Amino acid sequence: MTSTSPRAFGVRSMTAPLRRAVLRIPAAVGDFEGAGWRPPDARLLLSQHERLAGLLEALGVEVIVLPPLGGLPDACFVYDPVLVTGAGAVVLRSAKQVRSGEAEPLAAELEALGVPVAGRLTGEARADGGDMLWLDERTLLAGRGYRTNAEAHRQLAAILAREDATLERCDLPHDRGPAHLLHLMSVVSPVADDLAVVFEPLAPVPLLEELRARDVRWIAVDPEEYATLACNVLAVRPGVAIMADGNPRTRRALEAQGCEVHVYQASELSKGDGGPTCLTRPIHRSG
């Protein structure tokens, strides 16, 4: 698509209209087992990713598709290596060793797209973007678990303070342990200012209390559909969302709340346990 503001950037919302987003073509070859994937069909994996990009474009998003990154299977999950704020990209440091080479290349690609580096985690700080979501334009909620540590919280709070934003902390459960993925956004996806989807059995109590305090209603995802990523829903704009196909109960519940729901075929993309929010790095939301 052609953008009217080709270098526009800034994200301080999970549901404001998505103007620009980055996706990365999945690696067709690589150590999928070492990265924790179930073996995908490479041809279908690439086709499904292309169709997801096309769906976003059809919904009015300017999509920039980046090339595969050095045979790294997880590199297609572009939400995790950086956090985009109102000031630019904060370069994160992954606690998953096989993802340690993703952040700096993505930061350089974003700079070429007009998104400046607003900060970098250093030293012992470790964090994934999947542990972070904007509660409002001045408040970032960050999970504390096996992927994001307390030192990252400390450094992120200092970076956010430079743009008059604050960080709230939320401890995550052990679930199945450090070898298995559990991000904050594994258990919650905002869909509109007053609506989210939540997997209650793993949702931290402070998260639910925060949603209630903000008058946010939520749809409770059941365990069967949680396993097929029904809790991973990307808001394109308030009440318009993208989710993986094969989750009819959650889809119907969203539609009953007045949402417009679009689905994509995800049989291969989901083999790395990532949904549309993981596969999409918003770089500009506004309106």
Please report, for each region that a protein language model flagged, where it lies by residue.
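The feature marks the mature, well-folded catalytic cores of soluble enzymes
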Residues: T2-G287
